[in-house]
Amino acid sequence: MGASMNIGVRGSKLAIEYAKQVEAKCFNSFHTNLITIKTDGDIFENKSIQDIGGKGVFVSAIEQQLLDKKIDVAVHSFKDLPAVMDSRLEISAVLERNDPRDCYIGTLFPKAIVGTGSPRRIAQLKTNFNVDFDIQHIRGNIDTRIQKLEQGKYDAIILAVAGLEALDLQHK
């Protein structure tokens, strides 16, 4: 093995799984350490993304670690990146895109309580269904969202197929 590489990543199962993919595809000749970093988006899980700063809440703490040279590489989900990046940083690699589809878990019916944290998904629900759903905000990692569904807090939740597949949860 060659040099050592510290890879900064959020601590969710999904983020770690994606970091392992980056590790295997980009850094297989290095000894690597996955360094999990809590972000504002992780710490303030009960607040909306807009209430805690909007775009960047899942990346700013990791990027600061990169700028402070505490990590060598940061792994992010593209959807979490702000439109304008810090000029001192660059995107060095992008893995092939996974399945871009969304799916629902649960039961959809008129007035169903549907959980999503995405403005895009809310717009798609309102545009693509002639049904009046009760769309409620939901935050948390995939496991947390599924748990909230199973506890009866929602009738259905909308999730990314790619995330479910990465965690081998597509059977849900």
Residue ranges of predicted features:
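Domain-level signature for soluble enzymes in the chorismate/prephenate branch of the shikimate pathway
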Residues: 1-172
